[in-house]
């Protein structure tokens, strides 16, 4: 699980765990992009997917530099990560974004832990900070969109209610 990422003793293992997490995220974004209806959200999710692909490209040579073999495929978690999005698609865009938010919560936590380590070489830390900043931006966008969906839902509920009688008028029951 992503909640374990950042706790690895070895830096190469840490970076490989982040690569797996980003590969999982790419798969989840592919599933979300296929299923989401809103064109703006679809485009934004495409940009976020590209960020995760860049994370993999940036982290991979760092693992090699540390003398280890970089992972090249998503972890088994991808089934769970992608599955949240597939199931959410049954109920629409808002739930797809909610599923993606849980995924972004995981990646944010993982990158926060990785950046917080004091044994990470400075050139590796620079990459981790850049990736973490991307993750924060992804989550902020998704949270904003979820808030907008909630506001629209509230507005619709209010507009469908019967208006109150004018002040001073007898109420009819």
Enumerate the language-model features and the residues they cover:
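Alpha-helical scaffold segments that form or flank carboxylate-/histidine-based iron centers
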Residues: 9-18, 37-57, 93-99, 122-134
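Carboxylate-rich helix-loop segments that flank metal/cofactor sites and access channels
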Residues: 57, 61-108
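Preference for long, well-ordered alpha-helical segments
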Residues: 103-173
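Solvent-exposed, charged/polar functional surfaces in cytosolic regulatory/catalytic domains
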Residues: 28, 58, 62, 86, ...
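Long, non-catalytic architectural segments outside compact domain cores
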Residues: 2-4, 10, 24, 47-50, ...
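Membrane-interacting alpha-helical segments
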Residues: 2-12, 86-93, 145-157
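Alpha-helical bundle segments that constitute or directly flank the non-heme di-iron/ferroxidase center
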Residues: 2-37, 94-119
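Conserved alpha-helical segments that form or flank metal/cofactor-binding pockets of metalloenzymes
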Residues: 40-76, 138-149
């Amino acid at each position: 699980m992503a909640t374990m990422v950042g706790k690895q003793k070895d830096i190469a293992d840490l970076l490989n765990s982040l690569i797996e997490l980003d590969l999982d995220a790419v798969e989840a974004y592919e599933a979300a992009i296929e299923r989401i209806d809103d064109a703006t959200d679809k485009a934004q999710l495409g940009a976020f997917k590209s960020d995760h692909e860049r994370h993999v490209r940036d982290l991979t040579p760092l693992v090699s530099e540390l003398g280890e073999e970089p992972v090249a495929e998503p972890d088994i978690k991808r089934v769970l990560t992608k599955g949240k999005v597939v199931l959410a698609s049954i109920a629409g865009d808002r739930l797809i974004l909610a599923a993606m938010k849980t995924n972004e919560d995981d990646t944010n936590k993982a990158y926060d832990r990785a950046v917080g380590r004091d044994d990470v070489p400075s050139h590796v830390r620079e990459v981790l900070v850049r990736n973490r900043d991307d993750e924060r931006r992804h989550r902020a966008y998704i949270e904003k969109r979820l808030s907008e969906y909630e506001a629209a839902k509230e507005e619709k509920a209010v507009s469908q209610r019967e208006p109150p009688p004018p002040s001073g008028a007898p109420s009819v029951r």
